[in-house]
Regions:
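Intracellular loop-helix junctions on the cytosolic face of multi-pass helical membrane proteins
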Residues: 1-10, 134, 165-336
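Cytosolic juxtamembrane N-terminal segment immediately preceding the first transmembrane helix
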Residues: 1-27
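A gly/Pro-rich, aromatic-decorated transmembrane alpha-helix motif that marks the paired
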Residues: 30-31, 68-69, 152-167
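Short amphipathic helix-loop junctions that connect adjacent transmembrane helices
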Residues: 31-53, 271-275, 331-336
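Central cavity-lining transmembrane alpha-helices of secondary-active solute carriers
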Residues: 53-74, 121, 155-157
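Cytoplasmic membrane-interface "Motif A"-like loop-to-helix N-cap segments
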Residues: 76-88, 135-136, 307-308
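C-terminal ends and interior cores of transmembrane alpha-helices
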Residues: 86-107
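Hydrophobic core of transmembrane alpha-helices in multi-pass small-molecule transporters
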Residues: 94, 105-120, 318, 322
């Protein structure tokens, strides 16, 4: 894994292209979603714009929510690599389902994309971070290159999928299908290049077996122990994850119920079911879940001070960046 491509490790460029094709598929599909619903739908009468935006809002909200779950699953059970592979496969199937342009397959496709994104998005970034655990000074350049792939994929996806999707000679099936084809390319590339990562991204249950078979331990693959970097050891949990999860789930549910009550007290009762779910249920579900998730983390008594401070920093930054992404996602909705 010694760096020999622009001074970076070859594994970084595997992740670069995998993420690039995933972002191609995401933004390529997104640019077509609302336009397809208001112009074509499923061969019946097109949707009202308000309904299309409501569906887009539900989809986008869940796309941003599910990575919290996907990250936990990867950390505790799957490992980052398996999560990325599973997410890429599920998203490929989702794009294929949407390309059929049938109502049931369209909704199934959106559901698969939401689930796949939750598994894929947080965990490929985690693999990028682990590449330079023993060389933290190189991480800035590492992530700069990685995000160049994100931007390149988004640009190409928007250009090509919109061209084929809105072309009279091709149609929306080709636009949605093209997104799936490039997601499949990313999946295949990552699957066959796994050997280059060493032990990085393996599931917790696989690490001991890998180290025993190679005799490498943490020295291979760039993973460093805390003492090797002169850092405090990472906390291992307080053994109360289950009770804390239940307690904060209850708190999150109560908060969600309060937010729901406030929303319906100001809302027009005549809106249809889709808009009702988008406006009444999605905000409290997301807000309640985020509060429960954050509370579950910060209430861990085993957290070191440096870890707790970093968690609070993430929470503060996340709050303010919400407004950026809220405006950014209008590109696929109200600005389409």
């Amino acid at each position: 894994m010694k760096g020999n491509i622009f001074g970076q490790k070859p594994a970084l460029f595997v992740l670069f292209f995998t993420e690039m094709w995933e972002r191609f598929s995401y933004y390529g599909m997104r640019v077509l979603l609302v336009v397809f619903l208001v112009k074509v739908a499923f061969g019946d009468s097109p949707w009202d714009r308000a309904d299309a935006l409501a569906l887009y809002g539900i989809y986008t909200g869940l796309v941003y929510f599910t990575p919290m779950i996907g990250g936990i699953l990867a950390d505790k059970f799957l490992g980052y690599r398996k999560a990325v592979l599973a997410g890429a496969l599920i998203m490929t199937l989702g794009h294929a389902a949407m390309a059929m342009e049938v109502d049931w397959s369209f909704y199934l496709g959106l559901a698969l994309l939401i689930i796949g994104n939750g598994l894929f998005k947080p965990n490929i970034s985690s693999i990028v971070g682990q590449l330079y655990d023993k060389e933290p000074e190189l991480k800035d350049g590492d992530y700069t290159i990685f995000y160049m792939g994100i931007n390149a994929g988004a640009f190409l996806g928007i250009m090509l999928c919109s061209y084929y999707g809105e072309s009279a000679d091709w149609g929306y099936s080709w636009g949605f299908g093209l997104a799936g084809i490039f997601m499949l390319i990313g999946l295949i590339q990552f699957y066959f290049a796994q050997g280059i990562f060493g032990r990085i991204g393996l599931a917790p249950s696989e690490l001991a077996a890998y180290d025993a078979s190679t005799g490498s331990g943490s020295q291979e693959g760039g993973l460093a122990k805390a003492e090797e970097l002169d850092l405090p050891k990472i906390s291992q949990g307080d053994g109360q994850e289950g009770p804390r999860a239940i307690r904060w789930a209850i708190i999150g549910t109560v908060i969600a119920a309060v937010v729901y009550g406030l929303i319906i007290s100001f809302m027009d009762p005549q809106v249809n079911a889709l808009q009702t779910f988008s406006r009444q249920f999605m905000p409290p579900i997301i807000i309640g879940s985020v509060v429960a998730f954050v509370g579950w983390i910060v209430s861990d008594k085993s957290l070191l001070k440096i870890e707790r401070d970093r968690v609070w920093s993430i929470i503060v930054f996340s709050f303010f960046i919400i407004f950026f992404w809220w405006a950014f996602e209008q590109a696929g909705g109200s600005m389409t």
